[in-house]
Amino acid sequence: WDAGLYETIEFASIGDYVWLDSDKDGIQDAGETGINGIEVKLFNGAGTELGSMLTTNNPVGGADGWYSFTNLPAGAYYVIFDKGIYDFSPQNIGANDLIDSDANPTTGATALTTLTGGENDMSWDAGLYEINLPASIGDYVWFDADQDGVQDAGETGLNGIEVTLYNIFGV
C-alpha cells in the first residue's frame, strides 16, 4: 500500500484601512472615516510588485477604506499607498500600532514585515488628510469701448479699480 502525503500550506494576509485623518495627527480617532478608491500596491521583500487594489468597503461591517491582500506564502512584504489628492499623516505615532499611520510621509511605503504561514496581519494602514492649497484669482480690467464684453485691440487696461471677492453666501 502506498500512502500519499502532502504538505498543507497556510497562507498569510496583510491589510487594514486608509482613513481621512481630519486632525492630521497620524492616529485613527473615533469618527475618522475610511477613504475608498485609494490604490494600494503589494511588494515582496525583493521589491517586486505582486499586485494592487483600490480601497473599498470592508465585506464585514461595510466600513470604507479597507484593503486586504490574501493567499500569500510566508515571506517578507510591504505595501505602498498612493496618496492621490491627499497628503500623508505622520508615521508611527503613539504606542498602538493598530491605530497609527504606517505610510512613510514621503514615499507612501510601509516598513518591511515578515509574515508567517497562517498569519493575518491587519495592522498596515495609512492616514491621509486633505491638502488646503492657497488659491488666487485675477485677470485684467479694461475699458470696453464698444461694450461687447470682449477685449479688442486698442482697448486699454484700467488702473485703480477695486475688485471685491465674495463667497457663495455673498460675504
PLM feature spans:
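Acidic Ser/Thr-enriched surface turn/capping motif at secondary-structure junctions
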Residues: W1-V171
